[in-house]
Amino acid sequence: MSERKEGDSGAGVRSAVITQTKPKTQKPAMYRVLLLNDDYTPMEFVVYVLEQFFNKSREDATRIMLHVHQHGVGVCGVYTYEVAETKVAQVVDTARRHQHPLQCTMEKD
């Protein structure tokens, strides 16, 4: 009689057990989009930017604008990297086209 090897079903066919593992997905890193105060950009333009690119109501946009004006910096929103990067580019581009020195940056949340 021949020896049976582990996993040998006896008919010369080997069997194996395959376990399926679920991939672990991580939440993407989030980034804060920040507006920086300057002495030249009109407050109304800052409110416009907040309404246009961050979907803020007039009231919320005004509140954020005043916070930026009083504290030097304010958070416009928190987004994934790609979205935050796009919003920063949109704000900076629009400010330049309107000849305003408004600065917009992003930092990891």
From Swiss-Prot:
It comes from the Bacteria. GO terms for biological process: protein catabolic process; proteolysis. It holds the Pfam family ClpS. Residues 1-25 are annotated as: Disordered. Binds to the N-terminal domain of the chaperone ClpA. Belongs to the ClpS family. HAMAP family: ClpS (MF_00302). Involved in the modulation of the specificity of the ClpAP-mediated ATP-dependent protein degradation. This is ATP-dependent Clp protease adapter protein ClpS. The lineage of its organism: Bacteria, Pseudomonadati, Pseudomonadota, Alphaproteobacteria, Caulobacterales. The gene is clpS.
